[in-house]
Amino acid sequence: MCVAMVIIHTKTLEKKAVDDVTSEASLQPQEPLTMSQGTALFSCGIMDSGRWADVGSVCGVQQRPVGSSLESLWDSMREAGATGGISGLLRDLSLSEASPASAAPPSKRQCRSLSCSDELGCRSSWRPQGSRVWTTVEKRRCHSGGSVQRGVFNPSGFPAMQRSSSFSLPAHSSHLEPFTHGFPFQAFSECPQTPQTLYRSHEQICPAEASSPESTPELQRRSGQSGLARSRSQPCVHNHQKIGVKRRRPADSHKQRPSLDLLKMTQKLQDFHSLSCPGFSGDDKTLPSSSPALLNDTCERAQNDSSADAPIHQSESSSEDALIHQSDSSSADALIHQSESSRPAGKERECLWAGLCSRRGRDLFQLGGELDIEQIERN
């Protein structure tokens, strides 16, 4: 191995001495070649045919006879140092001119869920067109009244988000300020925070603050009363106690309802006469002393109002009064029936109450305790 290394070293020294003249001419500093402004990977522009020879000399492309394997290996290692200028030039070109990377569209799952993933925002600024599956952010409206507006997209790829006061982002959204107001190089200087998602389901909802006696004065009262029970109007309080329990009514509610009085419905004739004739009771079988005069007065008034011939009715009423006072009960009944039959048919109802009330005990129990339907209809 040592002998082989010595042979290789001597051969390289000989070749180096021969190629010193050509290498000095090629390693001199030359003017940079004019590059085009395109986005091609190896964009050397449009050059003349004479310049391709210069590029070939710079790149170290030389026609050499094929030698042994060791010589070709050593030559390729030496040419790698000469081609460092081209690789550095290409590296500077890629850094100075940032070409937009063509990123792939999101997966089908992201399109269906209509979600703005964090990985997609960090990778690229690819924005799809409006379609049925994917809806753009500016067309989506929040139901609570807050609108989402899409800001200017920076070269870093993060959108500047603005929201209305009714639906705001969490408190740490201030980290997005370098991306909206600064240059892209200033934005990359800080550690980038992941952009907040634009939908309510992904946002972190801050828990409510613990209630204190200052904020809720009812807590102090409840603590003093050793904890008040919940209201009975809420059905979830005593659900465990209500299984199989029937509602019991208080004992006072079982009161006897008023029943129908059948005795009043089957009244006798004496009760009917006691109700229809004032001043006359069923137990008392005699008329009071003033009742005939009162009944005669009512009959006279009815006759004066209803009849057209006043003198005829006055004579009839006077004759009836004389007959009633003079005769007994039997003769009075016969005269009353005769006078009723002698009158016209339209005047039968005039002195009806007088005849009814003038009857004595024989007439009271004449029907045997049954109601006279014809007399009820006449009344």
Swiss-Prot record:
Pfam families, A to Z: FAM53
Organism from which the protein derives: Danio rerio (Zebrafish)
Localization (cell): Nucleus
Keywords, comma-separated and alphabetical: Nucleus, Wnt signaling pathway
Family recorded in the similarity comment: Belongs to the FAM53 family.
Summary of the function given for this chain in its UniProt record: Acts as a regulator of Wnt signaling pathway by regulating beta-catenin (ctnnb1) nuclear localization. Required for appendage regeneration by regulating cell proliferation.
Induction summary: Following amputation, expressed in regenerating tissues.
Domain of life where this protein originates: Eukaryota
InterPro entries: FAM53 (IPR029356)
Biological classification of the source: Eukaryota, Metazoa, Chordata, Craniata, Vertebrata
Effect of gene knockout: Loss of posterior structures and beta-catenin (ctnnb1)-dependent gene transcription due to the absence of accumulation of beta-catenin (ctnnb1) in the nucleus. Fishes show reduced regenerative outgrowth following amputation due to decreased cell proliferation.
Subunit-structure text: Interacts with ctnnb1.
GO cellular component, one term: nucleus
Residue stretches of biased makeup (Basic residues): 239-249
Tissue specificity remark: Mainly expressed in proliferating tissues.
Polar residues compositional bias, start-end: 212-236, 326-342
Stretches the record annotates as Disordered: 206-257, 302-348
Principal place of residence: nucleus
A GO BP annotation: positive regulation of canonical Wnt signaling pathway
Protein name, entry field: Protein FAM53B
Motif (Nuclear localization signal): 246-249
